[in-house]
Amino acid sequence: MGNQAGSKTKLVIIQGPTASGKSELAVRLAEACGGDVVNADSMQVYRGMDIGTAKPSPELVARVPHHLYDIVDPDVNFTAADYRREAGRVITEIHSRGKRPILVGGTGLYIKTLIGGLAPSPGADDTIRAELEEDARSEGAAALHDRLAQVDPAAAARLHPNDRVRIVRALEVFLMTGKPLSEFQEEHRFADEPYDCLKLGISVERDDLYRRINERVNRMFAEGFVEEVSGLLNAGYSPDLKAMGAIGYKEVCAYLAGTCSLDEARELVQRNTRRYAKRQLTWFRKDPAIKWVEYPANFDSISTIAMKFFG
């Protein structure tokens, strides 16, 4: 189906900031092209974290096969290397059935790792790392993310503001070498990229995107987000887990601990999500391979582009 013997597997990648409509576009394209949807969002891999990660609705999931959602528990440290392995396996399986893989997500690091591999980077410095870990505990991961944005904006744009492990690592590399981690990654040229990719980015006006984000967060709280977080805590998952430090979960944990009001938590989730979306856009805009499209306005032309690509 559009892949000649010996040629690379064709892969459509739908990117864009949070709340831009990626999940629905992925399903509609999969229906039009005879495809399966593959998750590329670092938070949607976790079981039991549904509302706060804005997983595709049961109605969307019922329309076409979805892969790599709900695959690990929240206390598992699921890395970009883990993702590359699992996604590669799933894409091979989809292709073997004569179906077409449609990758969808906002985690730039996952997508970059899948299609290009992991770049070599310097070793570790235990002293520097210990100091950064202490800063993360006292100031919070978001403060370190702001610090990273000053010295390595490309890495900061790619990482969740609460992704403490990777933020600490990026700062550690810079403090050790004086060189941004993103530069090490940029210098890493991939001898054999395994996929022939069509990257589609959903273009959204910033004001419209921020409005969508605010509405989505209100909807999340109305649909039981606080109860979801409370259930995870009651199940024994620590608020200190990497997954529980994600935007939304961290703020609701603070509300449940009594350190802020419900309204304050909601407003913080909205603000932090808007900031994250802005950084996602910064990251995606730097990729000249992304073809920007308007959705849902131009679905027919998007579908035509994808069909022509698959052949």
UniProtKB/Swiss-Prot annotation:
Residues that, per the record, bind ATP: 16-23
Catalytic activity: adenosine(37) in tRNA + dimethylallyl diphosphate = N(6)-dimethylallyladenosine(37) in tRNA + diphosphate
InterPro entries hit by this protein: Dimethylallyltransferase (IPR039657), IPT (IPR018022), P-loop_NTPase (IPR027417)
Site feature (Interaction with substrate tRNA) residues: 107, 129
Biological process annotations from GO: tRNA modification
Domain of life of the organism encoding this protein: Bacteria
Residues annotated to bind substrate: 18-23
GO MF annotation terms: ATP binding; tRNA dimethylallyltransferase activity
EC numbers: 2.5.1.75
Family matches, as Gene3D superfamilies: 1.10.20.140, P-loop containing nucleotide triphosphate hydrolases (3.40.50.300)
Family matches, as NCBIfam families: miaA
Subunit comment: Monomer.
Name the UniProt record assigns to this protein: tRNA dimethylallyltransferase
Gene expressing this chain: miaA
